[in-house]
Amino acid sequence: MGFMAAVALVLGIGYVVVVFIVEPLRLRRRTGASGWVASLGATTAEKTASAMFLLGCGLELSNPALVLAGFALPRVDFPVAVAVAGAGLSVASVVLAAVSQHHMGQSWRTSIDPDNAAPLVTTGPFQVVRNPTYTSLLANSLAIGLLVPTPAALAAFLVCLWALQLQTRRVEEPHLRRVHGEDYQRYARQVGRFLPTIGRVSGFGR
């Protein structure tokens, strides 16, 4: 369990470094903007989603860290093959996030920027799901749980899922509808939110 916890912690930290540091720096070199946006005027929904997301990430990374520190957390004993699959899923999630951020270019931002409307991106991974970066976040959270299967891992995944659902449904999708109108609505009818075909919308406000 200690080895798997070490692998999980390295992969979890690696995901954060690649997605939130390396890729934004590469974006800054290409476009002059890193995508980091201060959400000073964030709504209550956005603030809540951000807080819950940070909580989920904290649970996700503290789970293997506590195991490495010697805490005897309740856990499920999965076959080694499940842990190997988790490691592979984590690596794949990093690749998906990096590819998604590359396709977004200047449209990738850490928060809604009401003063600078970004183009609607529907190419690459966005042809399959509307939020591939969020899909990668959830996949990485699931991967960490497969490597270190404890109640904390399940809680981390559920909190992250709740946070991303709130962020997309209450913050980002209404913004995209206001900015892109029928173009976004047509796109949302055809492409799923986090998984292919799942989360497609048939009308405004859903």
Tell me the role of every PLM-derived stretch.
Residues 1-115, 119-122, 140-206:
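Membrane-anchoring alpha-helices and their flanking helix-loop junctions
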Residues 122-138:
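Membrane-interface loop-to-helix entry segments
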